Amino acid sequence: MFQDNPLLAQLKQQLHTQTPRVEGVVKGTEKGFGFLEVDGQKSYFIPPPQMKKVMHGDRIIATLHTDKDREIAEPETLVEPFLSRFVGRVQRKDDRLSIVPDHPLLRDAIQCRPVRELTHSFQNGDWAVAEMCRHPLKGDRAFQADLTAFITNGEDHFVPWWVTLARHNLEREAPAMVESALNDAELEREDLTALNFVTIDSASTEDMDDALFVQDNGDGSWLLTIAIADPTAYVVENSELDLTARKRAFTNYLPGFNIPMLPRDLSDNLCSLRPNERRTVLVCRVTITEEGALSNDIRFSAAWVESKAKLVYDDVSDWLEGNNRWQPQDTAIAEQITLLKRICDARSNWRQQHALVFKDRPDYRFLLGEKGEVLDIIVEHRRIANRIVEECMIAANVCAALALRDHLGFGIYNVHTGFDPALVEQAASVLKANGVDADPQALLTLPGFCELRRHLDALPTQFLDSRIRRFQTFAEISTVPGPHFGLGLEAYATWTSPIRKYGDMVNHRLLKAMITGQQAEKPQEEITVQLAERRRLNRMAERDVGDWLYARYLQPQAGTDTRFTAEIIDITRGGLRVRLLDNGAVAFIPAPFIHAVRDEVVCSQETGTVQIKGETVYSQSDKIEVRIAEVRMETRNVIARPVA
């Protein structure tokens, strides 16, 4: 009787049209229900039965209904799924396979099956790569995924590395070597093999790409010669090797090992500036004044050099600090170290006055056993030898930036524009509230930014520095010259690590064109996009492996009385993020661990403080004592508790 009733159809259409709808992102919880967050402002409750149609992170359109004075969102249309390609652990029950995504808020197993070309017989606990193929909001009965790759079995000690690399779709191995002969024989090279070049690196470094030589001019100035390994002498542009290097963009440094951008035979042998071996290089010569300024006599050339010594950071630092457990092999090497120290001091002083110098932060190095277990975490403080190399490399990169700018007008530049113009007023307000008067327009200029940074660096704590960091832009890679506010420099273009950075290889080719007077082509914008994306992925991979190893390392400390000194690095509504200063691990302190009565504690990202009953008890950058409360291995999260 009601079939094909036009009035009923019209009524249904009216109801559909009149039902309010919102678009937002699903936020899952551990309790089965969820929320639809709209524009970060409003959230609507999603009951457990409705949550079965969606997944945490899905962007959806939902209809709104009222139930007992509560607005409820009912998922209707999928706008963008959260999961497409992902990694997870396979569960096998009888002959049925399912996969649990490796994500803190995705705990439900998803039915899955291997794609036809995948021959591996999956077992319980295996790690795999999967692609979502079915979704309830697309009209399917349930979620389903295709298994597209086997990563490793659950017992593999190196799961953190293999799973992380698969998650970010990064290579596991070095590129294969392709027969590579010296291909730029027509390039005229100076013979500088008689000069006392030295390399300074870690003891374990094999890919040495920079060597240094100093000449004392006798008038207080020095002639610094920086020799950089020349892989473009072997890697022809657009060759198979070059396209591989372009895709990888960087050597990927992970705890315990690296995955090189170039074949190891090139990076660790043919191009590496090994002691007493003749190598092709690009050379930059520049006079450095007694005050530490770079003179205008910057000159680039191609050359042959022969490093006379492979020096180690700690050995050189010990010797310069008066600890004589190690001695340079002869007086010529000793003289080079002494002259390099003088250049370092002069350049550092000049940069402190005319540019910006980063505050020294320690590096943390995992000491691993044969099965990937963390034996120890070594805190490596930056010492004088590290600073010598850093000052020489910064000088070399400034020289390249200026030479490429003046001769070609383009290159691969590292650009950082300081404060975001849209946020600079907020930055000025925060500064003013903390007793620092700053003109927003002046902060957008390089001199104004440098002046502020020097003022902040002179303050007794880093509270204000960490507060205004969120108003700054990120460093970018550009094909045209631009300032680098973070370094306080007019222009900065790296060319000193061509074995491990593709952008530096591009700059090498441009410098060679400049040296020979040949026509040079401006790099394609796609290269900067690829470099930026690969840098982001490599950093995420390093962080993910680190989180996994920290969780393994700290698990035995959970629930014990062991104390750690920690620095507050971030304050969110839910609590504090802290860095343990002894080992570099990041831990989270939930607000209830700070004060039992939740209504009396306010954690404010806006002010960078934690207040209890209106009184500030913690501020960003404070040092506090903590204990490890819990380590959640499945999410690699470390939960800490302040020591009362």
From Swiss-Prot:
According to UniProt, the reaction catalysed is: Exonucleolytic cleavage in the 3'- to 5'-direction to yield nucleoside 5'-phosphates
Where mainly located? cytoplasm
Presence of keyword Protein biosynthesis = no
Listed under GO cellular component are: cytosol
Q: What is this protein called?
A: Exoribonuclease 2
Q: Which domain of life does the UniProt lineage start with?
A: Bacteria
Instruction: Name the Pfam families on file.
Output: OB_RNB, RNB, S1
| Role description | Involved in mRNA degradation. Hydrolyzes single-stranded polyribonucleotides processively in the 3' to 5' direction.
Q: Say which family it is in.
A: Belongs to the RNR ribonuclease family. RNase II subfamily.
Q: Which GO terms describe its molecular function?
A: exoribonuclease II activity; RNA binding
Q: Enumerate the subcellular locations listed in this protein's record, separating them with semicolons.
A: Cytoplasm
* Family annotation (NCBIfam families): 3_prime_RNase, PRK05054.1, RNase_B
Q: What organism is the protein native to?
A: Yersinia pseudotuberculosis serotype O:1b (strain IP 31758)
Q: Which residues form the RNB domain?
A: 189-516
Q: Does the keyword Cytoplasm apply?
A: yes
| InterPro entries with a match to the protein in the record | CSD, NA-bd_OB-fold, RNase_B_OB_dom, RNase_II, RNase_II/R, RNase_II/R_CS, RNase_II/RNase_R, RNR_Ribonuclease
Give the keywords, sorted. Cytoplasm, Exonuclease, Hydrolase, Nuclease, RNA-binding
Q: Give the first-level EC class, as a single word.
A: hydrolase
What positions does the domain S1 motif occupy?
A: 561-643
Q: What is its EC number?
A: 3.1.13.1
**What is one Gene Ontology biological process annotated in the Swiss-Prot or TrEMBL record?**
mRNA catabolic process
